Amino acid sequence: MDTSLFSLFVPILVFVFIALFKKSKKPKYVKAPAPSGAWPIIGHLHLLGGKEQLLYRTLGKMADHYGPAMSLQLGSNEAFVVSSFEVAKDCFTVNDKALASRPMTAAAKHMGYNFAVFGFAPYSAFWREMRKIATIELLSNRRLQMLKHVRVSEITMGVKDLYSLWFKNGGTKPVMVDLKSWLEDMTLNMIVRMVAGKRYFGGGGSVSSEDTEEAMQCKKAIAKFFHLIGIFTVSDAFPTLSFFDLQGHEKEMKQTGSELDVILERWIENHRQQRKFSGTKENDSDFIDVMMSLAEQGKLSHLQYDANTSIKSTCLALILGGSDTSASTLTWAISLLLNNKEMLKKAQDEIDIHVGRDRNVEDSDIENLVYLQAIIKETLRLYPAGPLLGPREAMEDCTVAGYYVPCGTRLIVNVWKIQRDPKVYMEPNEFRPERFITGEAKEFDVRGQNFELMPFGSGRRSCPGSSLAMQVLHLGLARFLHSFDVKTVMDMPVDMSENPGLTIPKATPLEVLISPRIKEELFV
């Protein structure tokens, strides 16, 4: 080979080799963009605001700037934040199993029987078994049909209690009630009857003073649970600091967990005594009876936790999932209607057309109440019970929307932001139930198959109680709107302020004036 040609060829080969080597040394995986301003050690924690910060709104604003998928450094933890339905679909389909675990937080440890409450439990054989039992024995269509009388009777008694209050106050003019508190009592009654076979509130003196005291303790403890699980705890970002409990939150969590445990232990002991002296009635069994039968058959003995813990933790999961969330959604629905009076009238007119005023609304009427169904969907869109769903954790490395998500990363899905996407919804921040009848969202369902609308989540970690929730929401709202005329004092608009937490609780009471709009005998 000519010397001059060889001297030219060698540098070219060296250049190509160096270029290929550098290319091979480039990062194999690309991570989602991260907001600027991260600090050493704490990462992005300071950007998420204080304890009164509405995290889903803060993350929504970040997504407007950094895109639908972004990375956050939360102390020693890495998080992957999702803010679009396209990225969420990738999480809950292709990567659903890889992202199916839960982070081991202080709240789940201290208030959830050391991660035994299946809604907060890491992915495991125990989680699968407890979710399966809860789904089949309480939340399946067959079981819900068997327990229909509980749901219907509690709504009926709740409506009757409101009528009695109006009647006792003279029965001639509207009476003021705190609907938020009434809805909380009604939904707690319902789920406690299904789980433990007892009721707490109302019923014209049918509840003992002892049960009333326990009810207030339970209601207070549940409220504390949802508050504590939704606030920032230092040890979740820096596990090595758990011992110091710098904020005092872990002490509060332990106390709240203990308060709930006392109540649950009392329920189980009462059932033991009843079974000892009266035996069981299979068709009328509540969930504790079902769980105790499984324990007696040895079907809980092979699990990670002892039978008593398995029963208490699963009952707690059902109580938490079935009370506060339904009450909150109904509170927002009525608040939205009071601020949109023409829609309130339209909903009541629809009920009058299909039901009339000579009988009460029944489950079988709901399929004809199309506008009422749309109201519930629109409420769940604007105020999803879990605005960030439950945090997930990657069990293995995976790729989401082209971005690398390493094992151990926490997944945060901002459903609140996804369900206000202007590319999907016209006037996304406005209350427009019609969008689910003739508008852009008429084909959307809430069961997790349409990622543009998934208030109950999607995939393996979706809420197993969505069917029960929808039944409660539909019949509860229908019976209230059918039974009462409702307005605010001096027709003032309802304060729509939100409180921070795992859910979206209304910050202020919902004090309204009610009066009957159907005949008296329908309340008896």
Swiss-Prot record:
Enzyme class: oxidoreductase
Gene Ontology molecular function: any one: fraxetin 5-hydroxylase activity
Reactions this protein catalyses: fraxetin + reduced [NADPH--hemoprotein reductase] + O2 = sideretin (reduced form) + oxidized [NADPH--hemoprotein reductase] + H2O + H(+); xanthotoxin + reduced [NADPH--hemoprotein reductase] + O2 = 5-hydroxyxanthotoxin + oxidized [NADPH--hemoprotein reductase] + H2O + 2 H(+)
Transmembrane segments: 1-21
Tissue specificity note: Expressed in both primary and lateral roots under iron-deficient conditions, except in apical root zones, and mostly in the root epidermal layer.
Miscellaneous comment text of the record: Plants overexpressing CYP82C4, can hydroxylate and subsequently glycosylate 8-methoxypsoralen.
Protein name: Xanthotoxin 5-hydroxylase CYP82C4
Lineage: Eukaryota, Viridiplantae, Streptophyta, Embryophyta, Tracheophyta
Gene: CYP82C4
